[in-house]
Amino acid sequence: MKSLLLLVLISICWADHLSDNYTLDHDRAIHIQAENGPHLLVEAEQAKVFSHRGGNVTLPCKFYRDPTAFGSGIHKIRIKWTKLTSDYLKEVDVFVSMGYHKKTYGGYQGRVFLKGGSDSDASLVITDLTLEDYGRYKCEVIEGLEDDTVVVALDLQGVVFPYFPRLGRYNLNFHEAQQACLDQDAVIASFDQLYDAWRGGLDWCNAGWLSDGSVQYPITKPREPCGGQNTVPGVRNYGFWDKDKSRYDVFCFTSNFNGRFYYLIHPTKLTYDEAVQACLNDGAQIAKVGQIFAAWKILGYDRCDAGWLADGSVRYPISRPRRRCSPTEAAVRFVGFPDKKHKLYGVYCFRAYN
């Protein structure tokens, strides 16, 4: 017991001797690090930025370092941008930078770079925006053991529209719904996009898939059997369903296009096959559903002539309601999916700009 007590006393004296040899400055460095917390701060001037398909955008991100912090400036700064999936379960790599080393991933190659406005600027520039670029992006800055992140949302100007194929309503599983939107120059809409469309007046009584795998529908005028007679307006949520087996419609989203949408002046009405050929003869292609909605919503296109579209449907866009032309509201009117051999309609064409 005496030997153990002597060992403890010697250890205490040796520790006191060591503490006398350490400078006050060293003690302060440790004290500041403990009390002041992290020495790397990442911020975004805007939580959300807006653009459109084909445009350019800067996702803001700046970082601030404490130059007095122990170890500051020793490590290279690593900047990493990722995109969050709509269900927030995964992150998709977009861009990584460390010193002179830079790497771009996937479809972002050749379209993204750091703004580089200053040594503390981690803002990311995305050029030639696509519909798939919409979403939330995370900026992460790492220096040694210190790191911080910020999330920036990229919103696109555009229009949400409900869609179902020739087979009729409630015939698409989730994967087919995704492809159906792509076939119409669109992507499957997010909940935020549907919610914004509902706030803008979209009222649709058929449930459709959204990008997060949920099934919902927007009601501005509750009625039976659309949301219930005595209920409040809102986006009705059916929840999450089996993506392979469950079948619903889909809500698609599209944005500006780089081309010309127009109704082809032709001496006669056309069958579907004749309509396709007529657009080709005019140096164009038969238009898609997403293009007629974009022309109507974004450009204010108005035409009171029913015309064929690429999916075999017949529609016409009205931005100025009037007698015999959607008198009650501005809308893209849906005639249906008639027999493709019927020679009763004109055609809407789309000519892309190079």
From Swiss-Prot:
Keyword ATP-binding tagged: no
Where along the sequence do coiled-coil regions lie? none
Q: Which UniProt keywords apply?
A: Disulfide bond, Extracellular matrix, Glycoprotein, Hyaluronic acid, Immunoglobulin domain, Repeat, Secreted
Q: Which residues form the Link domain?
A: 159-254, 259-351
Instruction: Please describe, based on the UniProt annotation, the reported consequence of changing residue 333 to H.
Output: In a colorectal cancer sample; somatic mutation
The record ties this protein, via Gene3D superfamilies, to:
Immunoglobulins, Mannose-Binding Protein A, subunit A
Q: Which residues form the Ig-like V-type domain?
A: 38-152
Q: Which GO terms describe its molecular function?
A: hyaluronic acid binding
List, in alphabetical order, the GO biological process terms annotated in this UniProt record: cell adhesion; central nervous system development; skeletal system development
Give me the disulphide-bonded residues. 61-139, 181-252, 205-226, 279-349, 304-325
What is the recorded name of this protein? Hyaluronan and proteoglycan link protein 1
Q: Which gene encodes it?
A: HAPLN1
